[in-house]
């Protein structure tokens, strides 16, 4: 698809969490640069370190990215994000919690919640809360920013570094 074709399409505002626990700092920075090729990066959260969940392994680094893109959610996920994960060396196994070079999760698209576990997982809630603090939990109405504060304490998530959009 040419740049002109992309300009003529409706733009979508998508929040994506970039996660990695294999060569995590390098892969996080590279992935954010690669996301910039899929649209315009509007904002990038701080990078947070969270313990690996569900299996032994190095801690994860997680960063939320707010992206404006002409790609619809299915094209973005299945043609671009999955390919990017593979290009970064991710191997999918039966173990959903296995260490990985890159994990790209779509959290919201056009203000619609995609990741239903956002409010339960520190690795998602904490970085996303920096970009979308007013997002509310559909069942309780609790603000994501409030939930993230609790999850930071519960999981010992810690801020590692910040990446500027476009760097």
Predicted ranges, named:
Residues 1-5:
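A short, compositionally biased domain-edge/stem linker segment
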Residues 11-15:
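Extreme N-terminal starter segment of soluble prokaryotic enzymes
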Residues 18-20, 65-71, 108-110:
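Short beta-strand-to-loop capping motifs
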Residues 21, 44, 65, 105, ...:
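Residue-level signal for inorganic ion chemistry
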Residues 23-26:
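Short N-terminal binding/cap micro-motifs at the start of the first secondary-structure element
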Residues 53-61, 75-78, 82-167:
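Flexible, gly/pro- and Lys/Arg-enriched active-site loops
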């Amino acid at each position: 698809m040419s740049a002109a074709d992309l300009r003529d399409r409706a733009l979508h505002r998508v929040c994506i969490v970039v996660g990695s626990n294999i060569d995590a700092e390098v892969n996080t920075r590279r992935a954010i640069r690669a996301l910039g090729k899929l649209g315009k990066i509007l904002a990038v959260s701080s990078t947070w370190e969270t313990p690996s969940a569900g299996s032994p392994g190095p801690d994860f680094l997680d960063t939320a990215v707010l992206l404006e893109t002409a790609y619809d959610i299915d094209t973005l996920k299945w043609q671009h994000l999955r390919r990017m994960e593979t290009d970064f060396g991710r191997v999918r196994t039966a173990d959903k919690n296995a260490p990985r070079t890159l994990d790209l999760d779509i959290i919201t698209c056009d203000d619609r919640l995609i990741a239903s576990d956002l409010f339960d997982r520190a690795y998602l809630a904490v970085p996303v809360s920096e970009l979308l603090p007013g997002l509310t939990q559909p069942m309780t109405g609790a603000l994501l920013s409030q939930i993230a504060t609790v999850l930071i304490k519960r999981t010992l998530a810690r801020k590692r570094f910040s990446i500027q959009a476009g760097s």
